[in-house]
Amino acid sequence: MRDIDSVMRLAPVMPVLVIEDIADAKPIAEALVAGGLNVLEVTLRTPCALEAIKIMKEVPGAVVGAGTVLNAKMLDQAQEAGCEFFVSPGLTADLGKHAVAQKAALLPGVANAADVMLGLDLGLDRFKFFPAENIGGLPALKSMASVFRQVRFCPTGGITPTSAPKYLENPSILCVGGSWVVPAGKPDVAKITALAKEASAFKRAAVA
């Protein structure tokens, strides 16, 4: 069983995926893995999300997790579908305690110091900084990281292929989350693979 730190270190960019059509699940996963991005966050925002997770985890090399996990029940459902990690937009005590009890690799969302302190109280120290660009971007994250030196982040929300490398220069950032690698609409496998190759080459100060 992987912990969330090891998941975050696998690739510089974690694609944030919204699967609308179950037929797209396998080709998207294959294209991303072929491009060097093997950590796939499938958001639980569509009716076919859990089924998509089951399909994508069968793709060799794919490490599949669930995003938009809002409560303990959703975490359990994602775990049953075979997820290796779980991402939430925020953090509640109930969700955090449940994840710790289940030894689940949870990456909870934080937006301020109080959120981080709650996570630390629950035994968590890896967080999704969300929605990154709307809450001050890299300057805000740098300020937060200077206070919580043991914490590592995955900023998500408004990250672009232009801004991602700047975030990854910060040693408190293990990876970034982004949706740009899978543009909306019917998947263009060649384009997804090309975007993934570009993103997988981003350098990280926090990961040798």
Swiss-Prot record:
CDD domains: KDPG_aldolase. Induction: The eda gene is monocistronic and is transcribed from a single promoter. High-level expression of the gene can be attributed to very efficient translational initiation caused by the high quality of the ribosome-binding site and stability of the mRNA. The active site is at E41, K128. The keyword Lyase applies. Keywords: Carbohydrate metabolism, Cytoplasm, Lyase, Schiff base. The record marks T156 as: Plays a major role in determining the stereoselectivity. One of its GO terms (molecular function) is 2-dehydro-3-deoxy-phosphogluconate aldolase activity. Its EC number is 4.1.2.14. The keyword Lyase applies. It comes from the Bacteria. One of its GO terms (cellular component) is cytoplasm. It is found in: Cytoplasm. Homotrimer. Involved in the degradation of glucose via the Entner-Doudoroff pathway. Catalyzes the reversible, stereospecific retro-aldol cleavage of 2-keto-3-deoxy-6-phosphogluconate (KDPG) to pyruvate and D-glyceraldehyde-3-phosphate. This is 2-dehydro-3-deoxy-phosphogluconate aldolase. It comes from Zymomonas mobilis subsp. mobilis (strain ATCC 31821 / ZM4 / CP4).
